[in-house]
């Protein structure tokens, strides 16, 4: 009697007979490696078996990362085991981020914020402080400094026409005759502004008397309060003294304010 040939079926047929569908995914760990076996349909609608091998390694992670891995999963992944699920999670390369504060970099490169540099410079002693806070203010050093500046400004005013620089018509010596027709000479008059409200005529005289002789001074006051309105006019006897006053007092600190001194503009009849 001839032997009956045994026909061996494939594992896919056996799985179909036993389960009638896709079997569940299985995981086994052997020799420090994890084997994940899963089943799925390919493009031809045939069942296929996929085996993935993972190497198990231990690494030290921050506490926050370890705590996050213990969070309870939810939704369709609530029954998944700890760790990423290959069917729903794709692990990409690890990216390290470094946060930079652009404002701190700008402050570090700002030369004005350099503690080794001082932007203040005294006009009296050339120290690293403002002139209004100078300990030598009002002393002999202050007087000598103002006299030197007055001499330098007077020499510059005398040599100004020879330097080729533009001189306004009302400042030229040739206009003195025409100015005399108006009854007042503004060529030696200056306007001092940014004065404090407590300024008095005595303070104004004390401010300019060391520069040169004056012919007239006018301190603008408010009619109601009698306080200074913030500006004054000083007429010097010589134009070189007026130029020296502008050079010395313009930008000079006085009574916690920075003075602004310029030539007085002529009045039109």
UniProtKB/Swiss-Prot annotation:
Organism this protein belongs to: Drosophila sechellia
Keywords per UniProt: Cytoplasm, Initiation factor, Protein biosynthesis, RNA-binding
Q: Name one GO cellular component term.
A: eukaryotic 43S preinitiation complex
Which parts of the sequence belong to the RRM domain?
A: 188-266
GO BP, one annotated term: formation of cytoplasmic translation initiation complex
Q: Localized where?
A: Cytoplasm
**Assembly, per entry:** Component of the eukaryotic translation initiation factor 3 (eIF-3) complex. The eIF-3 complex interacts with pix.
| Alphabetized InterPro entries for the sequence | eIF3_g, eIF3g_N, eIF3G_RRM, Nucleotide-bd_a/b_plait_sf, RBD_domain_sf, RRM_dom
Q: What is the lineage of its organism?
A: Eukaryota, Metazoa, Ecdysozoa, Arthropoda, Hexapoda
Q: What does this protein do?
A: RNA-binding component of the eukaryotic translation initiation factor 3 (eIF-3) complex, which is involved in protein synthesis of a specialized repertoire of mRNAs and, together with other initiation factors, stimulates binding of mRNA and methionyl-tRNAi to the 40S ribosome. The eIF-3 complex specifically targets and initiates translation of a subset of mRNAs involved in cell proliferation. This subunit can bind 18S rRNA.
**Gene Ontology molecular function terms on file:** RNA binding; translation initiation factor activity
Q: What name is this protein filed under?
A: Eukaryotic translation initiation factor 3 subunit G-1
Known SMART domains for this protein? Answer: RRM
Family note = Belongs to the eIF-3 subunit G family.
The lineage's top-level taxon is Eukaryota
């Amino acid at each position: 009697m001839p032997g009956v040939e045994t026909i061996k079926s494939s594992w896919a047929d056996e799985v179909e007979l036993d389960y009638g569908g896709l079997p569940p995914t299985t995981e086994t760990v052997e020799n420090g490696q994890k084997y994940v076996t899963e089943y799925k349909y390919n493009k031809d609608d045939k069942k296929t078996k996929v085996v993935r091998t993972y190497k198990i390694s231990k690494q030290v992670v921050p506490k926050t990362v370890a705590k996050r891995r213990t969070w309870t999963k939810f939704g369709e992944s609530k029954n998944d085991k700890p760790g990423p699920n290959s069917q729903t999670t794709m692990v990409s390369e690890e990216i390290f981020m470094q946060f930079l504060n652009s404002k701190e970099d700008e402050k570090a490169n700002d030369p004005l914020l350099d503690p080794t540099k001082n932007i203040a410079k005294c006009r009296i002693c050339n120290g690293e402080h403002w002139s209004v806070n100078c300990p030598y203010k009002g002393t002999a050093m202050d007087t000598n400094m103002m006299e030197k500046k007055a001499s330098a400004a007077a020499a510059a005013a005398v040599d100004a026409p020879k330097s080729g620089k533009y001189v306004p018509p009302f400042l030229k010596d040739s206009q003195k005759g025409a100015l005399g027709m108006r009854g007042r000479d503004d060529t030696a008059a200056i306007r001092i502004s940014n004065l404090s409200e407590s300024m008095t005529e005595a303070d104004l005289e004390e401010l300019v008397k060391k520069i040169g002789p004056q012919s007239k001074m006018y301190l603008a006051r408010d009619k109601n309060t009698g306080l200074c309105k913030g500006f004054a006019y000083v007429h010097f006897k010589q134009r070189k003294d007026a130029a020296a006053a502008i050079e010395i007092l313009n930008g000079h600190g006085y009574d916690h304010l920075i003075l602004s001194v310029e030539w007085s503009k002529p009045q039109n009849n």
